[in-house]
């Protein structure tokens, strides 16, 4: 921590526990790294939590593990990742007793504490990352609560870089501080005096480049905006919604989608199909606005063709699955959509009337092998335009300017949005814009031609099938078989087309590098770029800059930017054709006559994500921010402040008057306004002196007693309480711990947290049957709505209920749903029919209850409602015994009884839990049972005390005729 404000933040947090809220990109990871380094050198037991996700936790572990290793921390003192699969329970106690820093999911630490594997009094403290996500139902809150109940001296350090998420709700900051058991709040925005003085003292040499979009791109963006507005207006009109506050589907698409989702969530189940299609269209159009600025012209046009083909196939019924019906895009039939496709097509190619007196110009490339080839027969000529991305030309000019600057030579670092842009720019610099786009266009034509051939074959076979309808049966069968075969081929072609247009970013696992280009001078304009070499980095944590590559001296690897006929066919461009370090070391002696070392400068293209260490490892002289981002610009400022003597020139590229520029500015303004709200709220923040829990823990569940207190007041006595004795008894009963046994897998949910808040003593066990054991006779299988549907489809639920029914007297199926997410058990269209399908969810529930008559189904609308239901079920019953759980009673031993026969016997009249075992002990099978007399039934069932009522029912069941 070389900067002064880092030291100040570290000292403040070291002296007092608190929540640190820091601006994005200012290096909050350096503060966390300082604490990890500080406690790694000691024997203290420190827990590291991440409130965001397990993936974020794993990425943090890899990052901090490598950084601490670089700092010289002993390997034995490095942090340890605690995983259920890798660390057995028998070794955890010894592991925790040795101390150290441990990364792990909060649910694992809670289980280790409740099972006494982790001595909570030995834990020195907890470090929490992404603390803004903690709530009163999160498992992190339960861990902090258990920690503070048994450890009054341990520290709690919380960190976050999302100030906007602390002010998006009223009282969110105060609740977050309460859940974290903290009293101090440390705010460090970019405009903080200490930070501004340090970062503004040594700013980088900034060159801002505002790039204008082409006319076609402006037309596309305008069409997308108009389509979005049309969809929003239709959505409001159809559902009679109020105006969507906070957004209009404009440039700030991220915030608008959140507002749209929040306002439509309570009524989602009531929306008709057309409304859901409009919501899907709004999201897609906002995504296309971002894709317009990132993708090349051919990729963007092919994406539009894929969307159109997908929507058309759904309309034609090629996909019978109802899950894909929402993907139909109604906006494709609008006039704005035609303008969108027209402008996108003009970026790739355009049509020109063919002059019969003159031959077509030779400089223009003509390809007529795609879906529009038929237009060539009508005196039209297709001319490729292949419009370059405007940022490509500016990037080329920047690199040319850097190369001409002989005084400053060093590594060039280009920051891009994601790995898709990394591959795009690397291929552009390798092969030139024309060759790169031409290869993409030829792939598009080949795919389109393939689909056209399939469509024509299908139409021909359909016509042949219709003309032969009057033939004999054999001919009809042959025609039907051929139609089926062609239909399957058509689907396969569609799947192939879909796979080829999958533009998701692929996560790489290693560093990809290419620097193979011609060393000699001369040639096309792009050859100057290749002299620099190109290195691609995927953002992996363990970044190791490889040794310099070798370049071909005879110029066999060169490539031009213009229409070189030998470079037109680039369907299979491979940028990973560089030699490996091992192979170079083996053959280095034989290559000296043909290769020489690549001279600087080098070009490193890196995605913005996971770029925390790339600046220190590369130490670039020139930095190009290709896609604007708040975090990366501030990382560059911090890097320059840490290295004031290192010259750094920063090129910052943005599209002028675009959604990209608007989103960047809006994020800056949103962060600034959020910090200003936090500063004002901090001055008025009400903090309980006992909130830290070092004296007494505050339990939020006690607030629910106010409803009970209201019922004990008498209005005629001036509000005085009545029945003081009953109130005291009620309070004593509530103070007594209620025990509940929970399956260890259920700690991934929030229900154990709510149960603990309401005074339950939680005992975690790995249950073989059920999820919750409330008493010796009550066992609950808990399902969410989605899990319920999946369990019915797989048959797992039937097996689970069958196991509970054999062991417990009162098996219960609890169906829990989210109150903020409405749902329907039956599709609205099916309710209009005269009968329900036997495969519908209500029909399956009815079948389940008829199969298991003792099963009870309970619906719960929230975790808090579930807790009250558990209180009612447990009332008057003894607490469960953990030693008896997972133990099958002796009377139900599977060695003595046939469970299938037992299930049949339970459905007969007169058979109950008191006499079923007596019957099975004295009768061999059902046939023997049906031949018994009434007196024998009474003797076996010991039913004389009941006036032979049950025996008579069972005897009549076997002996009465059906017509009686």
UniProtKB/Swiss-Prot annotation:
**Record field: compositional bias (Polar residues):** 483-492
EC no. given is 3.1.-.-
Give an example GO biological process: resolution of meiotic recombination intermediates
The molecule here is called: DNA repair endonuclease XPF
Extract one GO cellular component term from the record: nucleotide-excision repair factor 1 complex
Primary enzyme class:
hydrolase
Identify the domain of life. Eukaryota
Q: Which family does it belong to?
A: Belongs to the XPF family.
The record's keywords, sorted A to Z, are: DNA damage, DNA repair, DNA-binding, Endonuclease, Hydrolase, Magnesium, Nuclease, Nucleus
Q: Which GO terms describe its molecular function?
A: damaged DNA binding; endonuclease activity; single-stranded DNA binding; single-stranded DNA endodeoxyribonuclease activity
Query: Which Pfam families does this one have?
Result: ERCC4 (PF02732)
- Naturally occurring in which organism (per UniProt): Dictyostelium discoideum
Localization annotation: Nucleus
PANTHER family according to UniProt: DNA REPAIR ENDONUCLEASE XPF (PTHR10150:SF0)
Task: Describe, as the record does, how this protein assembles with itself and its partners.
Answer: Heterodimer composed of ercc1 and xpf/ercc4.
Q: What is its main location?
A: nucleus
Q: Which residues are in the ERCC4 domain?
A: 739-819
- Region annotation Disordered: where it falls in the sequence: 360-379, 459-529, 545-571
This molecule's function is given as: Structure-specific DNA repair endonuclease responsible for the 5-prime incision during DNA repair. Involved in homologous recombination that assists in removing interstrand cross-link.
Needed cofactors:
Mg(2+)
Compositional bias of type Low complexity: which residue ranges? 462-482
